Amino acid sequence: MADRLTQLQDTVNQQAEHFCNSIGILQQCSVPSKFPGFERTGSQTPQQNQQEDYAQLFSTLISRCAKDIDTLIESLPSEESSIELQVQALKRLEIENQESAEKLEEVVRKGELLLEKIQAALSDIAQSQLDMQYSSSPKKQ
């Protein structure tokens, strides 16, 4: 997962792409303007596009991307957060990390005990099967 700054860069780049694409669509869909003293021969009818409403599409994409940019900017740490607050947050995270490590060690210890019990039970079952096979086989004399 990318950090917040990289996400912000990617979202700004995406917004720039939306702007460029919307300008390209405007150029494709626009009616050519006539300039006095300049007559051009050839087809001057714009291409008919699909029925899709490009203006609505790009306005939705651009506004959604702008909201994402605002959200990412708000999630960045501010200068107002002092060194003391950052140190307290780090200490709290270290304590949570230590507690999680202790819980993990306890779970691993219990898992190892269960594994030993299961292995002992499987060994007993295998030995019982061998004993039953040995006792039920005919003895040669």
From Swiss-Prot:
Write the record's keywords in alphabetical order, separated by commas. Activator, Coiled coil, Nucleus, Transcription, Transcription regulation
Any single GO molecular-function term of the entry would be: transcription coregulator activity
Subunit-level organization: Component of the Mediator complex.
The record, for PANTHER family, names: MEDIATOR OF RNA POLYMERASE II TRANSCRIPTION SUBUNIT 21, RNA POLYMERASE II HOLOENZYME COMPONENT SRB7
Q: List the GO biological process terms.
A: regulation of transcription by RNA polymerase II
Coarse class of the primary localization is: nucleus
Per the UniProt record, the lineage of the source organism begins with: Eukaryota, Metazoa, Ecdysozoa, Arthropoda, Hexapoda
What this protein is reported to do is described as: Component of the Mediator complex, a coactivator involved in the regulated transcription of nearly all RNA polymerase II-dependent genes. Mediator functions as a bridge to convey information from gene-specific regulatory proteins to the basal RNA polymerase II transcription machinery. Mediator is recruited to promoters by direct interactions with regulatory proteins and serves as a scaffold for the assembly of a functional preinitiation complex with RNA polymerase II and the general transcription factors.
Q: Got a GO cellular component term for this one?
A: mediator complex
Among InterPro entries, the record links this protein to:
Med7/Med21-like, Mediator_Med21
* Protein encoded by which gene: MED21
Q: Name one Pfam family in it.
A: Med21
Q: What is this protein called?
A: Mediator of RNA polymerase II transcription subunit 21
User: Where is this protein found?
Assistant: Nucleus
Residue stretches in coiled coil: 79-122
Q: Which family does it belong to?
A: Belongs to the Mediator complex subunit 21 family.
